[in-house]
From Swiss-Prot:
Function recorded in the entry: Catalyzes the condensation of ATP and 5-phosphoribose 1-diphosphate to form N'-(5'-phosphoribosyl)-ATP (PR-ATP). Has a crucial role in the pathway because the rate of histidine biosynthesis seems to be controlled primarily by regulation of HisG enzymatic activity.
Broad EC category: transferase
Organism placement in taxonomy: Bacteria, Pseudomonadati, Spirochaetota, Spirochaetia, Brachyspirales
Name of the molecule in the record: ATP phosphoribosyltransferase
Pathway per the UniProt entry: Amino-acid biosynthesis; L-histidine biosynthesis; L-histidine from 5-phospho-alpha-D-ribose 1-diphosphate: step 1/9
One cellular component (GO) term of this entry: cytoplasm
Length: 206
């Protein structure tokens, strides 16, 4: 049995379709239900539907053999897994943004609101900028509007959410983020042939 962790939310159908194309289908997964575990014994596959930020943990701890996760989450959490394939969808960037017309005072500590604490720290350390990191878990765009922060660090796809809230990108911190296929290190050793076959088949349909 191969256990595959899929990210709950907007990408789950796209990711599942990828596995369906290579013969690991489970039609029940696309039905309107609240189940989080889907098993197809004929195909020897079990899908686990988990929060995107938790996919890496499930794979690192061996609960899942394979997972699909955004590169941003891998950079933020530094999970001890093998990153084996860029799936080339779910593309976005990690950017610093603020309200339109914002002018930075370089003499003052910069207040940064973000859910990407480690990515932000690494970036600002690299440019020797003194910052206060304010960790938020959602509605990051509100922070500079309400003066909770000077800037935000967040993922940007089209930029429409920023524009709708009168925010603009100041700096592109990471220019390419996409969905990645990750593998548990022990699984890669003991299920190597199966995992390599899955990767080869995925590469052929990308």
């Amino acid at each position: 049995m191969i256990n595959i962790a899929l990210p709950k939310g907007r990408l789950v159908n796209k990711v599942y379709t990828l596995f369906e194309k290579i013969g690991y289908e489970n039609k029940e997964l696309l039905e309107d239900n609240r189940k989080l575990v889907f098993e197809n014994k004929d195909k020897n596959v079990r899908y686990l539907i988990v929060k995107p930020s938790d996919v890496g943990i499930y794979v690192e701890k061996g609960v899942a053999d394979i997972g699909i996760v955004g590169k941003d989450i891998l950079l933020e959490n530094n999970h001890d897994v093998y990153e084996l394939l860029d799936l080339k969808f779910g593309k976005c960037r990690v950017c610093m943004a603020s309200v339109n017309g914002y002018k930075e005072d370089i003499e003052r500590r910069l207040r940064v609101a973000t859910k990407y604490v480690n990515i932000s720290k690494n970036y600002f350390n690299s440019i020797n900028r003194d910052v206060e990191i304010i960790k938020l878990n959602g509605s990051i765009e509100l922070a500079p509007i309400l003066n909770l922060s000077d800037v935000i660090v967040d993922i940007v796809e089209t930029g429409s959410t920023l524009r709708e809230n009168n925010l603009t990108v100041i700096k592109e911190i990471i220019d390419y983020i996409s969905a990645r296929l990750i593998v548990n290190k022990v699984s890669y050793k003991f299920k190597n042939d199966l995992i390599k076959t899955i990767i080869k088949n995925i590469e052929e349909v990308l």
